[in-house]
From Swiss-Prot:
UniProt family annotation: Belongs to the class-I aminoacyl-tRNA synthetase family. IleS type 1 subfamily.
One GO MF term: tRNA binding
UniProt xrefs under Pfam families: Anticodon_1, tRNA-synt_1, zf-FPG_IleRS
Function: Catalyzes the attachment of isoleucine to tRNA(Ile). As IleRS can inadvertently accommodate and process structurally similar amino acids such as valine, to avoid such errors it has two additional distinct tRNA(Ile)-dependent editing activities. One activity is designated as 'pretransfer' editing and involves the hydrolysis of activated Val-AMP. The other activity is designated 'posttransfer' editing and involves deacylation of mischarged Val-tRNA(Ile).
Localization: Cytoplasm
UniProt entry keywords in alphabetical sequence: Aminoacyl-tRNA synthetase, ATP-binding, Cytoplasm, Ligase, Metal-binding, Nucleotide-binding, Protein biosynthesis, Zinc
Annotated residues for binding of Zn(2+): C905, C908, C925, C928
NCBIfam families recorded: ileS
Domain notes: IleRS has two distinct active sites: one for aminoacylation and one for editing. The misactivated valine is translocated from the active site to the editing site, which sterically excludes the correctly activated isoleucine. The single editing site contains two valyl binding pockets, one specific for each substrate (Val-AMP or Val-tRNA(Ile)).
Subunit structure of this chain's protein: Monomer.
Cofactor: record remark: Binds 1 zinc ion per subunit.
GO terms classed as biological process: isoleucyl-tRNA aminoacylation
Name of this chain's protein: Isoleucine--tRNA ligase
Amino acid sequence: MSDYKKTLHLPVTKFPMKANLTQKEPEMLKRWEQTDAYRIMYSTGATKEPFVLHDGPPYANGNIHLGHALNKIIKDIIIKSRNMQGHPSQYVPGWDCHGLPIEHKVEQQLGEKKKTLPAHAVRRECRKYATKYLDIQRKEFKRLGVMGQWDNPYLTMTPAYEAATARELVRFMEKGSVVRSKKPIYWCCSCETALAEAEVEYHDHTSPSIFVRFPMPDARVAEILGTDPASTSIVIWTTTPWTIPDNMAVAVHPEFEYAVVKNDGQHYVLAAELAASCAETFGWENPQTVRTVTGAALEGLVARHPIYNRESPVVLADYVTLDSGTGCVHTAPGHGREDYETGLRYGLEIYSPMNDEGRFLDSVEFFAGLNVFEANPKVIEKLAELGNLLAQAKIKHSYPHCWRCKQPVIFRATTQWFISMEANGLREKALKAIRNDVDWIPAWGEERIYSMVENRPDWCISRQRLWGVPIIALLCESCDEAWYDTEWAAGIVEKFANHPTGCDYWFETDLSQIVPEGLVCPKCGGTHWAKVKDILDVWFDSGTSFAAVVEQREECSFPADMYLEGSDQHRGWFHSSLLASVGTRGIPPYKAVLTHGYVVDGEGRKMSKSIGNGIAPQEIIDKYGAEILRMWVSSADYREDVRISEEILSRLVDAYRRIRNTCRYLLGNLSDLSAADLLPVGQLESLDRFALDIAMRAHKRVQAAYNDYEFHKVYHTLHNLCVSDLSAFYLDILKDRLYSSKADSKERRSAQTAVYHILMLLIRDMAPVLSFTAEEVYSYIPEALRPEAVTVFALREDDIPPMEMPAAEREDWEAFLAVRAEVTKAMEPVRKSGEIGHPLDAHVTLFMDDALAAKLKATGADLRACFIVSKVTVAPLAQAPEQAYTSEELNGLRISIAKAPGQKCERCWIWSEELGSSSEHPSLCPRCTGVLCA
């Protein structure tokens, strides 16, 4: 018996079956650098409009986490896919380098030493810290296979960037939008600074809940309420007892009904709808409602503060609700936005007598020196002592906490710098831009940011810290009046731009060189000045990146095509960027905003140290390779929260292996093919043209998915193409033709041509996601076949020949696929019975009606080869024997399966009745004999 296996054209390739990604990926990164693959990618075949994706800067603090990886990989997929579609697109990564987290870390490192160091020395340490971590993060991002201008990123701490940020402040000043005033803002007593809404997180917190009576000695009580003022009180409810010392009024709703409830000789005013529940809370045994009045009737009555001998008038406010409490709201204008607005309306004092640590000043009787949370029990104790505490309890509720130190924050009125939302119509313009000028992806993002902008207060842009861009203004030391002049401020900005460390100039330079000569305070005539010590909100820093980067870098153009970050940035970077741009340019800085969800564990829980369910990107890279992380990003709909677990990663590894093995098989069948051997698509065998049609339509679906940012569709389309359309169908059929036919025969070259085009489509579609693997596959394409492009990322759509079938021809092939599926079903019981083993042992007879037979004939397919059997006979439906399989899916089809006649060819394993046509090869079929004797 001859060893005919050696005569078969089995797949040959050096492309390894085992990916060995953890070792191979670093080698590929070096290769990309050596070949300048990134530059080649964006400069090759740039025939369409450029696409600008502007990077939201991550914070230069700590190692990257999976949220960073998700974000950067999505951006990389977009940049690569846009370039490969002919849209030149560069990626300019950035880092947010200023702000509280870095300053905190530096304070911890410096300890007591910080108190003796000048501001610029502390800032120098902050700069070093930020530089250290941006270098660490840069390496980690590059390891993910993300391409970009890594050697020329934008940093918010460079002189040029700091000057650009300060310049935007001056623009707002020129428009009259910048104001300095005393308003309640979020305040962190631990960090001793104002906080933006985006810097506040909500966590469960247990607070004291108290009901307090305010005596109403006003003589008009007798007339309006019909009660003795000496026995009448108005009742409030609060969960912040520490604000009671700062109470200035009690607010009621003008349209609500308020009851005067008598109990045990005393009269209490509260909302009629809540009277019964309050009476139960207070333990009143026999309450009686003696009168009801509207809230409007109560306006102007004067209550007495429950602790101090001062007045607390009754005022009206539409924000009062009946959801809980008493319908009468304790009002402290120094500790709440609505309270503040009510205070302005009624001329109440904006009273907030505490220092930056949140401790009451010495002027506050009974509570001096206590911080707000220490004061809570003391206030309750004092109220009880004075007989004004009606009830107390504990309540667990969602409460604002500092994003950095995780401590509860307070609302506190302090003198801060604001950008007015009403001056120059900023709110109205921003809302109009949200509706008309931006594509929000997903669409729900539009309503989210719209409601935030619609309801937000003025933008507090000042922070009481060191590490940031200073607010360019002076303070009169005599009267605390602020002064700035836009021409003077613009001159300071240029100093920042030309200073080696940017706005360190403000902190290093002597005051005499900052203050204009002879400057006199316009308010008091004072001549002694101090620099403003506050710095700009870091959200103003990053929010002006459009001015520092998008408008300045030659790789970019304003407005950017896209901003892309996590969904929390509707109140963060998207928000501040929108206000900064609309406020100075009149238009948003972006045409589209795309958001992704958070990374959660396999059960949908947030990653948490306390749960211990966190996974670092490096762990996954070390175990599986970055390619699996990239595949994970593309496998899920990132617009929702994205799950990750060992089980999910294991499934992805299996899917990756199937895609890789498909690529390897395709490569293996190209080893003896050159570009000159490729046949025109129109001359290919019908099955090969159908396979190309399948691959081309998959390619178009993939490209549409890239355009629509639906990368999960890319993953599923590619996986299904490899597993179902190729491995389980086309390549399975093709084996006989590729292995057994004459090497240079037309039928084999037809198959190889199709395999080549399918592989080229596949690696094009893979490259934005499976970048390492696509490049590796491309490098293993035989040199005689490989295009001139140095990198897979230089391949373009223009290089693809037309490969789609006419619709009518495709319909015939789809009918064939349906028949093939029925043949497989019909064969199952015959194989189970042992009558035949391998499908090649079978003789299939198709009994079909004329219409179905005509469709199969129209395909021109070799049915024997396509069904992977040894013989196929087609007969009229009427001739079908009674025992023939009847298709439930296709009308007009019955199938008989029998053992193939003849003997099995030793070379191709197909059964033939014509074995032994050559005495030299007596065990071969005529086709195999012809191949060997040619």
